[in-house]
């Protein structure tokens, strides 16, 4: 590997609006202090995060590359040109760890193809923290992203994941758009078998954090308001 190349730092961010230094190690602060080029999903929120970590850092001097659903795949290799010229780049997620349920994975793959060193930094991952605290199988689990919006398709997918969990003894993880969270927990309680375990991990790392695992039947009786709150759902059928 060419040691004169810059490195691609994978920089975790907070999962909410709490103090970054409550959940991020000092190394993250140091890397941000020493980096002026960033690949981000949203420039406004990324700049706000950088300012909270390093208030003294000059914002006008930052170079920002946008990586979101509007970014052309053909543009991605050029984002890493500074690394080829010996300059480090930071890859930021909107929340949590870059490359995990995050478009940053495409840039990381290109970095490997170009023999650019990839350096993951320590930080919160809502997916891992949810499975850690669920009491479910942390040896075998799968993240399934978003479930279908259509009522019939969603019901079929919930039943399919329940079957997979039972057949493979595998925890099934998924998410929902926050304003549909309450509908999701209602659907899980009504569609799953009564003894299937359901974990709701909401507002992870925040002062309003709520994490609870109980059966689908118990969720019918114990209501919780998840509206517009970042939530991870996990099911496991024994």
Q: Can you describe what each PLM-predicted range is?
A:
Residues 1-67:
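Glycine-rich, flexible N-terminal cofactor/catalytic loop recognition
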Residues 2, 6-9, 87-88, 166-238:
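A contiguous loop/helix-start segment that scaffolds small-molecule binding in enzyme catalytic cores
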Residues 9, 106-164:
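Class I SAM-dependent methyltransferase SAM-binding "motif I" and its flanking Rossmann-like core
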Residues 32-38, 115-119, 171-172:
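Short active-site oxyanion
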Residues 44-46, 96, 126, 180:
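Alpha-helix capping/helix-boundary segments
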Residues 65-72, 147-151:
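Conserved helicase motor
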Residues 68, 76-118:
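Glycine/small-residue-rich loop that forms an oxyanion/phosphate-binding "nest" at active or ligand-binding sites
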């Amino acid at each position: 590997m060419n040691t004169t190349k810059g490195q691609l730092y994978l920089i975790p961010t907070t999962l909410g609006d709490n103090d970054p230094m409550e959940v991020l190690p000092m190394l993250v602060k140091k890397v941000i202090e020493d980096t002026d080029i960033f690949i981000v999903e949203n420039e406004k929120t990324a700049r706000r995060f950088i300012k909270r970590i390093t208030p003294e850092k000059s914002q006008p001097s930052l170079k920002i590359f946008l990586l979101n659903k509007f970014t052309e795949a053909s543009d991605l290799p050029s984002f890493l040109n500074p690394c080829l010229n010996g300059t480090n780049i930071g890859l930021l997620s909107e929340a949590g760890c870059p490359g995990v349920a995050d478009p940053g994975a495409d840039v990381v793959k290109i970095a490997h193809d170009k023999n650019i060193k990839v350096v993951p930094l320590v930080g919160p991952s809502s997916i891992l923290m949810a499975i850690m605290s669920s009491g479910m199988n942390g040896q075998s689990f799968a993240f399934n992203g978003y479930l279908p919006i259509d009522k019939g398709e969603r019901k079929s997918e919930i039943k399919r994941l329940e079957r997979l969990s039972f057949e493979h003894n595998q925890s099934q993880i998924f998410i929902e758009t926050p304003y549909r969270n309450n509908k999701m927990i209602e659907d899980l309680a009504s569609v799953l078998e009564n003894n299937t375990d359901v974990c709701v991990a909401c507002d992870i790392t925040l002062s309003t954090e709520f994490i609870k695992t109980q059966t689908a039947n118990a969720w019918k009786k114990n209501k919780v308001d998840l509206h517009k709150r970042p939530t991870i759902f996990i099911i496991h059928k024994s």
